[in-house]
Amino acid sequence: MNKFDFNNRTAVITGGGQGFGLDIAKRFLDSGAKVIIWDIDEKLLKSAATEVNNENLSYNVVDVSNYSQIEQNINQITSKTNIDILINNAGITGPTMPLWEYDIEIWNKIVKINLLGTFNCCRAIVPNMIANNYGRIVNVASVAGKDGNANASAYSSGKAGAPALPEL
């Protein structure tokens, strides 16, 4: 298989309802993959499915900070097919302000989605990949995670963790 031939492969893309996640989904579809996009916003997912209009695209409403939702969706998917590829793209930016002004609930929400969500998806999907002796994971990060941003510390901290997760 050449590196851009994903026929007979299934990709799950988090944060796939719009933007970069949807663009990634389109590229995988163009390369022959079956694609399942996850997002917390059902309206975005429906709009994405209408825009793409491809029988190999499906979607599920999933909050990546909720491990039981992820497990349910994975069990549903793996009862029909393997999950070969995971693109952890889900993320939110939140408000820009100095660290000491952040409300702890807002901070926690951002980190739960941007870091815990990535961990949750890896933790839940990797056993399926191991059992099938194939799997590829891409954790989408940000330059803000590398360089930091004094006024977006929750976002920067959450995104810094994605590449720090160990290679599987």
Indicate residue ranges for each PLM-predicted region.
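Active-site helix of classical SDR
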Residues: 122, 158
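Substrate-binding pocket helix/loop in short-chain dehydrogenase/reductase
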Residues: 97-99, 106-108
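Residue(s) in the substrate-gating loop at a strand-loop-helix junction
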Residues: 142
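Active-site loop immediately N-terminal to the catalytic Tyr-X3-Lys motif
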Residues: 100, 147-153
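Canonical Rossmann dinucleotide-binding motif of NAD(H)/NADP(H)-dependent dehydrogenases/reductases
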Residues: 3-35
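The beta1-alpha1 cofactor-binding region of Rossmann-like NAD(H)/NADP(H)-dependent oxidoreductases
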Residues: 42-43, 61-72, 104
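Conserved NAD(P)H cofactor-binding loop of Rossmann-fold oxidoreductase domains
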Residues: 90-95
